[in-house]
């Protein structure tokens, strides 16, 4: 890593290209399969047909609607229906490899299966396996602020109790050695029956922060009862106990993959649904078993309207990357799912919201969906990790390709993600790198789900160690061993920059982030300088000069506060004098806050309406100190 940094420090725009394509493996990305090879690779096949082999984790090249990743551990059982047989003995009575049962109020874990364990957890030293990084212990020094009444004491290790013994075993198999700060607090908070709104820096273990406690409590308490009012067609409908909503197909697939690891040998069967893939195949997968459902809002709304999913048994609702979902316009679907369908009300479920940033608008949303929640802020939320070495290079647009080749030639190890602003540039840049002998692939919104999954599989396994991506991969994706991020095109929003470079330096590992900056990026210069200062990074002279020029011009160059400014993204809104029905005390935990009254006219432009469920039940935002099902 020191060698890479040294070579980067010596870079200049005048240096020539050092492609050295002859020394690299000849890989042909999916979108170039129809091009004549020209001596640059031996792979053939159809341009849009994916890889001509079946080596990528069981992907089926003959399916255009995405691979069958709902079959737990790769097993494709043919179980149909029968979801209502959980009311007494034996939920999912037919034993399956790696799948336990809930029988007569007791959890019966399945026997261990070596083949499944190898498939789920991989082998040490494999490129797809990431262990705790060398700086993981530094997380112990990250400040944590928890506000709310009666915050439970954090845990210090993965032990049983408070966690279920089976979950502890699965966590060890996944090579997690100690909880991150967000996990230390989320486990006891969920165990205490409390709602949670958590902010944590990118790469700090937010996925485990909700999967660990939700699965652990599910193992100990069992599935929810299916409503007795289920109709004649209920055998075709699934009744999950937990629902996780996230904004993108890639993120829900990633959460599902993690859920499979931690649900191994348990009664809980994870499933995933998302748009862009064959809905018929997803329905068939749901019918094989669904206790924990991971979904994008649009596809879930579709399945609810088709009568294939019921939320009547939901105990746990998780909203991951909530700010991103609002940015993408999912708020109407989310409100419909939570407030207008058959999901239990706010008093009868536990709700957890996780994200790297929580501006005021998201905290407003929390007043409808959460009750007497605990607000958890871990580290510099909305900032960058000091595990990431940030380098800002001044590069004019016409010189970017040459400088990029120098960077890639200097960094022969690890995985590299290159971010562009447009889909066309992503394709063009991937083609250019391929022609220069660099095995690259690309993902963006115009690629089919099948092509995106193939590209990510090739990237994760190191077959194509360079991924050119638009913002579709910027949020939430947790790809092991990404050592270098290149912002070929800087975003116009500084928060997008934060999330992009957060793809490296994850779980305590060290990474490098390089950005190509020129005067076309003046709109984010102030925010960029602030971020570099916060993370104790070197600020180049040209950046300070342009920042001073921008400030002298009298214009705000904050660049990145699309949701009302980053300053409010780390603080509990209840402590800022918002329109809650009560103030917060000055105790260490921020005091308690009464959230009564729903939305009022003093919301400063906040949402109006949506104060209650359409079926006439009590309005959201009215707190209760108890959970009826705990």
Swiss-Prot record:
Residues 187-376 form the Helicase ATP-binding domain. A motif (DEAD box) lies at residues 320-323. CDD domains: DEADc_DDX3_DDX4 (cd17967), SF2_C_DEAD (cd18787). Its EC number is 3.6.4.13. It holds the Pfam family DEAD. Residues 1-49, 78-111, 554-630 are annotated as: Disordered. InterPro entries: DEAD/DEAH_box_helicase_dom (IPR011545), Ded1/Dbp1_DEADc (IPR044763), Helicase_ATP-bd (IPR014001), Helicase_C-like (IPR001650), P-loop_NTPase (IPR027417), RNA-helicase_DEAD-box_CS (IPR000629), RNA_helicase_DEAD_Q_motif (IPR014014). Residues 387-547 form the Helicase C-terminal domain. Residues 1-14 have a biased composition (Polar residues). PROSITE patterns: DEAD_ATP_HELICASE (PS00039), HELICASE_ATP_BIND_1 (PS51192), HELICASE_CTER (PS51194), Q_MOTIF (PS51195). ATP binds at residues 200-207. GO terms for molecular function: ATP binding; ATP hydrolysis activity; eukaryotic initiation factor 4G binding; G-quadruplex DNA binding; G-quadruplex RNA binding; mRNA binding; RNA helicase activity; RNA strand annealing activity. Residues 38-48 have a biased composition (Gly residues). It catalyses: ATP + H2O = ADP + phosphate + H(+). It is found in: Cytoplasm. Disulfide bonds: none annotated. Residues 15-26, 78-91, 601-630 have a biased composition (Low complexity). Keywords: ATP-binding, Cytoplasm, Helicase, Hydrolase, Initiation factor, Nucleotide-binding, Protein biosynthesis, RNA-binding. GO terms for cellular component: cytoplasmic stress granule; spliceosomal complex. A motif (Q motif) lies at residues 156-184. ATP-binding RNA helicase involved in translation initiation. Remodels RNA in response to ADP and ATP concentrations by facilitating disruption, but also formation of RNA duplexes. Belongs to the DEAD box helicase family. DDX3/DED1 subfamily. This is ATP-dependent RNA helicase DED1. It comes from Debaryomyces hansenii (strain ATCC 36239 / CBS 767 / BCRC 21394 / JCM 1990 / NBRC 0083 / IGC 2968) (Yeast). The gene is DED1.
